[in-house]
Amino acid sequence: MWDTTPATKERSGKDCFMANTTRWVKTHCSRMDHGGCALLVRAEENRIVEIKGDPDGYLNQGYVCLKAFASADRLTHPGRLKTPLKRVAGRGEGRWERVSWSDAIELISDRFIKIKEEHGARSVVFGQGMPKGPELFALVRLANVFGSPNVVAPQDVCHAPREVTGIHTCGFYPVADFHHPSKLIVLWGSNVTSTNEEGQICSLLLKQLAQGTEIIVVDPRKTALAEKAKLWIQLRPGSDHALALAFLNVIITEGIYDKAFVEKWTYGFPELAAHVQPYTPEKMSEPTWVAPEIIRKGARLYATSRPSALQWGNPLEQTIHTWDSVRALICLMAVCGNLDEPGGNVQANEPDLLELGKFVRSDLLPSKRKEMIHAFHGTIPKMMTVPSAYLRRAMIEGVPYPVKGAYLQGTNSLLAYAESKLTLEAFMKLDFLAVSEIFMTPTAALADVVLPAATSFEFNDIGHYGLGHGYVLARPKVVEPPEECWPDLRIVNELGKALTERQLWFEDHEEILEAVLKPSGLTYREFSEKGFLKGPERFNKYLSSGFRTPTGKVELLLSQAEKFRVSPLPEFNGLPENPDPDFPLVLTSCKSRYYLHSSYRWVERLRRHRPHPKTEIHPETAARYEIHDGDSIIIETRKGSMTQVAHVTDKVHPGVINSAYGWWFPEAEGAFLYDWERSNYNMLTSTERLGKAFGTPNLKGIGCRVRKAS
């Protein structure tokens, strides 16, 4: 019998998790990925013994990846953090003493209040890794109530460029609609059968393919889907904006765009048409490495196959040209009539939930947008979090003002932020650093206080997809956490009581879940029984109310470009880096299906599948440098070097090196930060040049060279 009842005050503790009981719980995956997969989890005596996919799952329909099967291993790992720790030696030396939760909370609050008194509230920042539930919004609330405008998260290289550019261009974030049939799906830098930041839509895509939908894959690597595609476009890493502009050139020049939609619902089409004339397939073939006839074939397929969905991936947001890449692709969706159409790219509608602005208490910090660190660097409005490059400048140089303290939850920033050496320098300069984690990481090892977090299956949770997808998922508790491991939501709630006025917080952190759900008319128990909430499906909304832009139309020509100091039309202003004969190869990276960013290298079941950091190199290139499969190799850029293991494969272009990201070694010594430098991709990246709109660094398309390690 399935149990969907959450462990709440109505049904908690021993009543819910009695010994000598076996129970199945319907829940959703979390913290191994974004968490879209519905799961059936079996627990015995407060221990998870079986996990499988739920065939009734809205997104995954029974499919789950290896990470889901291994997710319970985190809960019982012998190296898990189980008590608050305080540093008793030099920062990063790996010497700790156990402290109580009350002492840890008091120490953090005392130090942050002292920094606030000496430097102002904005000199304390609050940081989040990849958001997975309401804990990010609780953290934003904590910052606002405390008086700091600064929350740091990886939005500048993940989601925000697509979301914010969409809002400015067409009034919403256009996501691929896999719930309705498409004639064609374009996977642009999106490897949904292996890794997928959008939530698990792999099964929905495979279902469409089985029903005859064709696909185009735009990717530097020959992915599994590239081998099945109608067309695989193997572009040079970091040249997405050039290829998208060439598509626009073909479609407009040949007159195969949606003339009725363009005439009535776009602003600036004549200007765009004139602007893209120079971006011919012949001219764009050189920077993209794509033959002109392939460019034409791809453009024609997309324009003449309606509806077409463009599923775009994270790589688009990882160069200094992300604004132009994303703008060009939204223009492409618009001129081909695929915006707000079933089976095209659509706007999700949220279910009835507590308004975000009210929950995070934006009213307490009305000047926030002007006071955030990146506002002083001229980024485009609507960025909710601070780009990491600008954060570190504040920590190291005091620009635009000093940052002296930080609280981080669920982020291994030392590995995640570009140009890792600067992250180490920045954290070493802090007066105080506190970290919430489930396992000691290189970042946690630098902290003054480390707090042991509960992880998924150990607390009631809401998976929030909000802006992008319009649904929220129930993640009811399955087992009790170790006694001193707290959910991040509880940690933030208790920190809020210590740092600010208690009446601004909740008596119990689970009241936050009830508050979020209240507008829906459901309690958390009722929500868990339903499994998920989805906003209503509405298409072609522009027919009655236009688009939510200043002109009421899709702004191919951005009407507020001068105000935001950005280009009004998408441009090609070169590659991420200019070619350099000293670094003749092009470096890129991709995520592993076995890990989530830098997480879970310590989960043995996953590590067995990928024990070493792998760099893909083409056979011709390997032969030139006398490299064999399995060799240790050194990859170098202008910024630094790292060592990984060579994997010789024709899945990459001879001019491309594809390296693994997020690697550190939990088996190494904590006093040396777990060999964080050895194979760390971000030892090779730079923040010297940043994208104007979002402060995005170049993580792809970087000049490099390789050699065999001695």
Task: Describe the function of each predicted region.
Residues 90-92, 188-190, 228-229, 279-282, ...:
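Flexible glycine/proline-enriched surface loops and loop-helix/loop-strand junctions
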Residues 229-235, 454-464, 470-481:
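Short beta-alpha connecting loops at secondary-structure transitions
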Residues 2-254, 283, 291, 409, ...:
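N-terminal export/assembly segments and adjacent metallocofactor-ligating motifs
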Residues 49, 258-259, 295, 309-310, ...:
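Acidic/polar loop patches that form or flank catalytic/metal-binding clefts of enzymes
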Residues 17, 478, 482-533, 606-616, ...:
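Long, contiguous, secondary-structure-rich segments that constitute the structural scaffold
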Residues 124-132, 268, 286-287, 313-320, ...:
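Conserved short loop/turn motifs at secondary-structure junctions
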Residues 137-207, 211-218, 241-245, 331-445, ...:
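Extended redox/cofactor-interaction regions of prokaryotic respiratory oxidoreductases
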Residues 129-130, 264-267, 302, 345-356, ...:
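A glycine-rich phosphate-binding loop feature that marks nucleotide/adenosyl-phosphate handling sites
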